[in-house]
Amino acid sequence: MITLKEALKLSKDELENFKNDLKAKIEANPELNAYIDIYNIGDGVPIAIKDNIQVKDWSVTSGSNILQGYIAPYNATVIEKMLSAGLSPFGRTNMDEFAMGSTTESSFYGKTLNPHNKDCVPGGSSGGSAAAVGAGLAIAALGSDTGGSIRQPASFCGIVGMKPTYGRVSRYGLGAYASSLDQIGPMTQNVEDAAILYDIISGHDEKDSTSAHKNDKVSDKLNPNRKIRIAVLPKHIQNASEDVKKAYELAINALKKVGHEIVEAELMDAKFDISAYYITATAEATTNLARYDGIRYGNRVVGKDLNDTFVQTRSQGFGDEVKRRILLGNFVLSSGYYEAYYVKAQKTRHLIKDQYSKIFENVDLILSPVAPTTANKFGELSTPMEMYLSDLYTISVNLAGLPAISVPISKSSEGMPIGLQLIANAYDEQTLFDGALSLEREINYNA
C-alpha cells in the first residue's frame, strides 16, 4: 500500500486507477467487515471515515440500529478540511455502537475481524478504521478517541493511531459520546503520514466552542534527531502481560540507543482512572443520547402512543452496551448519588490532570503501554468489567486532555502486534511526533 505522502503526489488519473483497484480489493475481502459502505466519490486521495463522522449525503449511523435511515445533511469540519487539502472520504468504517466498546463487537453491522488473526478482535471503538489500514485496504483513516478508541485498535492492528490534544481538532460533525473527552484523530501506516493528516484536520473552528485557538503545523518541522527527555513507568506496567513488558523494554532500549534521556516516573493507581472515566463518560453519554428518540431522525418504532413510541424506539434501537451505559449515567446523575459519584469523579479528574502536569515539569514525553495485552479472541472478555479494564492505560490521557500516539513496536509470541504510546503535554504535538518518528525509525517494525 502506498503511503499518504506518496498518494498526495499522484496525478488525477493515477488516483482514479488506484481507487478503483482499492475498491475491488475491498470487495474481494468482505469477511474482514472493516467497511460498512464504499462510496468512492471525489477525485482526491481516498481516506476511510469512521461511521460517527458526518459526510454529506452519506448514511451515518454510529454503528447503531437507531440511526438506520439517517442521511447526513452536512459535512463535519474535518471533512471540509480534508476536501480543501485534496483528500476525499472514501468509505465509512465499522465501529462499536456509539463508540461504546473496545472490540467492535457491539456494532449493528456485525463484528470486524483483526487482519492479523481472524479469531481476534481489532480493538475498538475505531476497529473498522484500524482493520482497514492494517489490512492494506486504506491509505489512512479517521477515528475518534474517547478513552483509547484510536490508540488501542491501532496497537492491536499494528498501525499508528494518534489522539490530539482536546480542542486541537474540531468536534463539529462528530457523533458525540462524551463531549469533554471525544477527539477525532488520524490512523495511518506510519508516523509521518499521521503528522500530515493531523495537520490537515487540526485548527480552530468557530463551529466548535471547545476548539483551541491554535493552528501551528508539525509535519514540515519533524525532527527525529532531536534529543528528548522521556519518562518511563516501571510500576505502572505491572499489570501488563509478559509480551507487552518485553515490548516496553525493547522501546526503552531503542530510545536510549538514539540518545534520548530516560527517567523513571510514577502515576497514581489506574483504578481511580477507570472509575473517574466511566462515571464521567456515561453521565455525558446519557445527555448526548437523549436526542435519539425516532421523532426527528433515524429509525422509529411506532407504539400505542407518543410515550410508547419513545420507549419502543429506544428499547429496540439501542444495543445492550449502550443501554448499560445510559443506565449507569442516569444513576450517577440522579438525586442522592450526584455528589457521591459524579462530583467525586470530577475531583479525581483534576488530580489526574495535576499529576501529569507535575511529570511534564521535568520531562518532554511519557512512554506507556496502550493495552495490558495483545488483541483478545472474540468472546474472551466475558463481562463488561473485563472490557472496561482493557482501557487501563489509555483513559487517563483523555481525562487530562493530552495528546498521545500509539506506535507499533513488536509482535507477541503468537504473532500479534504490540503498540506502545507516547504521551505529550497539552498542545505539544510537535514533540510528540518528533519522539514517535525517532522511535519508529529505530524500531523499524515490519508488519
UniProtKB/Swiss-Prot annotation:
UniProt organism field: Sulfurimonas denitrificans (strain ATCC 33889 / DSM 1251)
UniProt-listed PROSITE patterns: AMIDASES (PS00571)
Q: What class of enzyme is it?
A: ligase
Q: Which residues form a coiled coil?
A: none
User: Is the keyword Zinc-finger assigned to this protein?
Assistant: no
- What family is this? Belongs to the amidase family. GatA subfamily.
Give UniProt keywords alphabetically: ATP-binding, Ligase, Nucleotide-binding, Protein biosynthesis
A GO molecular function assigned to this protein is:
glutaminyl-tRNA synthase (glutamine-hydrolyzing) activity
Report the NCBIfam families cross-referenced here.
gatA (TIGR00132)
InterPro entries named in the record:
Amidase, Amidase_CS, Amidase_dom, AS_sf, GatA
Residue numbers annotated as active site: 50, 125, 149
What's one Pfam family here?
Amidase
* Function noted in UniProt: Allows the formation of correctly charged Gln-tRNA(Gln) through the transamidation of misacylated Glu-tRNA(Gln) in organisms which lack glutaminyl-tRNA synthetase. The reaction takes place in the presence of glutamine and ATP through an activated gamma-phospho-Glu-tRNA(Gln).
Task: List the protein's name.
Answer: Glutamyl-tRNA(Gln) amidotransferase subunit A
Disulfide-linked positions: none
The EC number of this protein is: 6.3.5.7
Phylogenetic classification of the source organism: Bacteria, Pseudomonadati, Campylobacterota, Epsilonproteobacteria, Campylobacterales
> What are the record's GO terms for cellular component?
glutamyl-tRNA(Gln) amidotransferase complex
